[in-house]
């Protein structure tokens, strides 16, 4: 038999639930604009820009080569994939993985990430836990097992309380992870207000900071271009155009009426 249902005071909604939502939302908004002010443009070398443009040209050739004559397609393909002196064969780039010890820019970016992500979460989370501790704020609309009690009832140690109830501290963390759709609606898809996404990026920052291997990209593009054959897409375009009823007479009448009025 289920125990008696809890009845929360309406003042909890006004002085605990809504303030936590508003504070979390505006902290995310401030974090977004502070991140924009602190972000630094990544400088690319001339070699990196040139390599990226070459890969784009090869990809465009594979996708749209059917709209140019076969000889033009083979000439461009020969420039990239010539077995002896083709660009993808003769070009070898030296990949040097960056190190925070030798790269001050990478170290600065890591410090900026800590300032805009970790520090606000510690300060705001600690302040909310101190100010609104001990409150039961809301209840999820479905039953949960006892394994969810440590996650949803931080700061409340009641063994008899149903696991569906949410404490004030847990309500803050639910807002941190649950407001991402609101941030995307207001600030766009790629925003710095989503703290959960920034935490994931910070955890995988070392892997993301590793540069892409240009030699592997050249090899992959060489294989893809090598398998691409020329398929002339404009073979019967003249016959198809002449076979269509273009209705030029009606178009000329419409233009004449427009010019008169």
Swiss-Prot record:
<feature type="topological domain" description="Lumenal">
    <location>
        <begin position="131"/>
        <end position="168"/>
    </location>
</feature>
<keyword id="KW-0472">Membrane</keyword>
<comment type="subunit">
    <text>Component of the ER membrane protein complex (EMC).</text>
</comment>
<feature type="transmembrane region" description="Helical">
    <location>
        <begin position="15"/>
        <end position="38"/>
    </location>
</feature>
<feature type="transmembrane region" description="Helical">
    <location>
        <begin position="115"/>
        <end position="130"/>
    </location>
</feature>
<protein>
    <recommendedName>
        <fullName>ER membrane protein complex subunit 3</fullName>
    </recommendedName>
</protein>
<comment type="function">
    <text>Part of the endoplasmic reticulum membrane protein complex (EMC) that enables the energy-independent insertion into endoplasmic reticulum membranes of newly synthesized membrane proteins. Preferentially accommodates proteins with transmembrane domains that are weakly hydrophobic or contain destabilizing features such as charged and aromatic residues. Involved in the cotranslational insertion of multi-pass membrane proteins in which stop-transfer membrane-anchor sequences become ER membrane spanning helices.</text>
</comment>
<dbReference type="InterPro" id="IPR002809">
    <property type="entry name" value="EMC3/TMCO1"/>
</dbReference>
<dbReference type="GO" id="GO:0005789">
    <property type="term" value="C:endoplasmic reticulum membrane"/>
</dbReference>
<feature type="topological domain" description="Cytoplasmic">
    <location>
        <begin position="188"/>
        <end position="261"/>
    </location>
</feature>
<feature type="topological domain" description="Cytoplasmic">
    <location>
        <begin position="39"/>
        <end position="114"/>
    </location>
</feature>
<keyword id="KW-0812">Transmembrane</keyword>
<dbReference type="GO" id="GO:0045050">
    <property type="term" value="P:protein insertion into ER membrane by stop-transfer membrane-anchor sequence"/>
</dbReference>
<dbReference type="GO" id="GO:0071816">
    <property type="term" value="P:tail-anchored membrane protein insertion into ER membrane"/>
</dbReference>
<keyword id="KW-0256">Endoplasmic reticulum</keyword>
<dbReference type="Pfam" id="PF01956">
    <property type="entry name" value="EMC3_TMCO1"/>
</dbReference>
<keyword id="KW-1133">Transmembrane helix</keyword>
<dbReference type="GO" id="GO:0016020">
    <property type="term" value="C:membrane"/>
</dbReference>
<comment type="similarity">
    <text>Belongs to the EMC3 family.</text>
</comment>
<feature type="transmembrane region" description="Helical">
    <location>
        <begin position="169"/>
        <end position="187"/>
    </location>
</feature>
<feature type="topological domain" description="Lumenal">
    <location>
        <begin position="2"/>
        <end position="14"/>
    </location>
</feature>
<dbReference type="GO" id="GO:0072546">
    <property type="term" value="C:EMC complex"/>
</dbReference>
<dbReference type="GO" id="GO:0032977">
    <property type="term" value="F:membrane insertase activity"/>
</dbReference>
<dbReference type="InterPro" id="IPR008568">
    <property type="entry name" value="EMC3"/>
</dbReference>
